[in-house]
Amino acid sequence: MKFKLQDHMLVPKHEVLSKEEAEELLKILGIGKEQLPKIKADDPIAKEIGAKPGDIVKITRKSLTAGESVFYRLVV
C-alpha cells in the first residue's frame, strides 16, 4: 500500500492546469511563465500529480484569514 501525499491533512491541494487554463492565467496576470515561482519536477507532490517541466501547478491552501489562498508554481 502506497501513501498518497495529498491524503495528508497538512498538504494543500495541488493540481496541474490544462494548457488553456495556464494561458488564461498568464493573460490575466500579465506575466510570462518564467515569472512564476518554481517547483522542481522531482518534488514528491509534483511526481504524485504527474507534473512535467513547463506545467503550471495550482496550489490551494486553507487560510485562517482569507478562508482559501491560491498559489501557482511553474514546474522546472
Swiss-Prot record:
Gene Ontology CC entries for this record: cytoplasm; DNA-directed RNA polymerase complex
EC number, as in UniProt: 2.7.7.6
Subcellular location field: Cytoplasm
Main location: cytoplasm
Reactions this protein catalyses: RNA(n) + a ribonucleoside 5'-triphosphate = RNA(n+1) + diphosphate
Pfam families documented for this protein: RNA_pol_Rpb5_C
PROSITE patterns attached to this UniProt entry: RNA_POL_H_23KD
Cleaved signal peptide residues: none
InterPro entries reported for this sequence: Arch_Rpo5/euc_Rpb5 (IPR014381), RNA_pol_subH/Rpb5_C (IPR000783), RNA_pol_subH/Rpb5_CS (IPR020608), RPB5-like_sf (IPR035913)
Record's keyword terms, sorted: Cytoplasm, DNA-directed RNA polymerase, Nucleotidyltransferase, Transcription, Transferase
Enzyme category, top tier: transferase
GO MF entry, a single one: DNA binding
GO biological process per UniProt: transcription by RNA polymerase II; transcription elongation by RNA polymerase I; tRNA transcription by RNA polymerase III
Family the UniProt entry places it in: Belongs to the archaeal Rpo5/eukaryotic RPB5 RNA polymerase subunit family.
Subunit text: Part of the RNA polymerase complex.
Protein task: DNA-dependent RNA polymerase (RNAP) catalyzes the transcription of DNA into RNA using the four ribonucleoside triphosphates as substrates.
PANTHER family reported for this sequence: DNA-DIRECTED RNA POLYMERASES I, II, AND III SUBUNIT RPABC1 (PTHR10535:SF0)
Protein name according to UniProt: DNA-directed RNA polymerase subunit Rpo5
Organism: Archaeoglobus fulgidus (strain ATCC 49558 / DSM 4304 / JCM 9628 / NBRC 100126 / VC-16)
Gene encoding the protein: rpo5
